[in-house]
Amino acid sequence: MRIVLVGPPGAGKGTQAAFLARNLSIPHISTGDLFRANISKQTELGKLAKSYMDKGELVPDEVTIAMAKD
């Protein structure tokens, strides 16, 4: 099962994701957490994501997916 929660900052995505993960026994993957961890560790994917974020652009799906697979 895959569930994607979309919304602006502060909309409650994290709260709802935690609720669903807990009650449906499914993993909770936060792209924001993935970005922050990779940027903090200065991984190649983190540097690439940061280059998009610094320009105010969305991080391409390919980069996000690669982080999730890592």
From Swiss-Prot:
Pathway: Purine metabolism; AMP biosynthesis via salvage pathway; AMP from ADP: step 1/1
Alphabetical list of Pfam families matching this protein: ADK (PF00406)
Subcellular location, principal: cytoplasm
GO molecular function annotation: adenylate kinase activity; ATP binding
EC number(s) from the headed UniProt entry: 2.7.4.3
Annotated residues for binding of ATP: 10-15
InterPro entries: Adenylat/UMP-CMP_kin (IPR000850), P-loop_NTPase (IPR027417)
Signal sequence range: none
Location in or out of the cell: Cytoplasm
GO biological process, one term: AMP salvage
PANTHER family to which the protein is assigned, alphabetical: NUCLEOTIDE KINASE
Free-text note regarding domains: Consists of three domains, a large central CORE domain and two small peripheral domains, NMPbind and LID, which undergo movements during catalysis. The LID domain closes over the site of phosphoryl transfer upon ATP binding. Assembling and dissambling the active center during each catalytic cycle provides an effective means to prevent ATP hydrolysis.
Record function comment: Catalyzes the reversible transfer of the terminal phosphate group between ATP and AMP. Plays an important role in cellular energy homeostasis and in adenine nucleotide metabolism.
Family: Belongs to the adenylate kinase family.
Summary of subunit composition and partner proteins: Monomer.
UniProt name for this protein: Adenylate kinase
Organism: Streptomyces scabiei
Gene expressing this chain: adk
